[in-house]
Design a protein with these regions (language model features):
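Acidic, polar-rich low-complexity tracts and alpha-helical solenoid repeat scaffolds
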Residues: 1-246
């Protein structure tokens, strides 16, 4: 993983993983290695190698969390390459997955696709391309693609998700003040959006850890707990709020 995503030595990482797969490993460990291998192939834009490996993990670990994760990543891959109906059919099944985080991620991506598919397919194609650039850590290209939606396909449907992706890039680039302002635009301007609780949680963590604004972070945690009671982040927010309060 370090070789592929940090040191940009994909081929060496692939060789190491393929060598490891020849060892006498448990079914779970083989599945984990195949997942890493698929992630690298996707990073390299070898999407058919990636989808084959994700499908193998899904099939061999169907009822396990790693199987659900592989199915989600395969749906995400299809979204990246513009096969939206295929992705949506898988995501709609995954929304009832045992893992709350997988179910939540599936719900979010499902809504991004379904809302934009109905409203503006060109904006959706651009969002998908930007997301793929983000996966590949090509942040400058991703930002340009997101900005192009604002210029050529401005719409309120895609805006909360677009802002969240720009906030993620700012966060990754350690531009925490920009990330903070973008998260705020989501939960203040689009409070009814399915992204609002996610924006609150991410902003609270950022305010606490990187901007040293503990009081403001507590306000975000409290708002999330009070106003988004069904959020997957409520328990985490409650624990963080108590820790800061005490």
């Amino acid at each position: 993983e370090i070789l592929a995503f940090k040191l940009d030595d994909n081929e060496k990482a692939i060789t190491l993983l393929n060598d490891a797969l020849t060892l006498n490993l448990s079914k779970l460990n083989k599945a984990k290695l195949k997942m890493k291998l698929a992630d690298i192939y996707l990073f390299k834009e070898e999407v058919w190698e990636a989808t084959l490996l994700y499908s193998q993990v899904d099939k061999s670990m169907k009822e396990e969390p790693i199987g659900h994760e592989a199915r989600f990543k395969n749906a995400q891959l299809r979204y990246y390459i513009g096969e939206f109906d295929w992705a949506l059919s898988v995501l709609n099944i995954l929304k009832s997955a045992t893992s709350k985080l997988i179910a939540n991620d599936a719900m979010t991506l499902s809504l991004v696709i379904s809302d934009n598919l109905e409203y503006d397919t060109i904006a959706l194609q651009r969002l998908a391309k930007a997301d793929y650039y983000i996966y590949q850590k090509k942040y400058e290209l991703a930002n340009k693609m997101l900005d192009s939606i604002n210029i050529y396909n401005p719409n309120e449907v895609s805006m909360p998700y677009l802002l969240m992706r720009k906030a993620y890039i700012a966060d990754e680039n350690q531009d925490y003040n920009l990330a903070d302002s973008l998260y705020k635009r989501v939960y203040q301007g689009y409070a009814d959006s399915y992204m609002a609780d996610d924006a609150l949680m991410k902003d609270a963590v950022l305010l606490e850890r990187f901007l040293d604004k503990k009081e403001e972070a507590m306000e975000c945690y409290a708002k999330l707990i009070d106003e988004y009671t069904a959020s997957v982040y409520v328990a985490q927010a409650r624990n963080a709020y108590r820790r800061l309060r005490d």
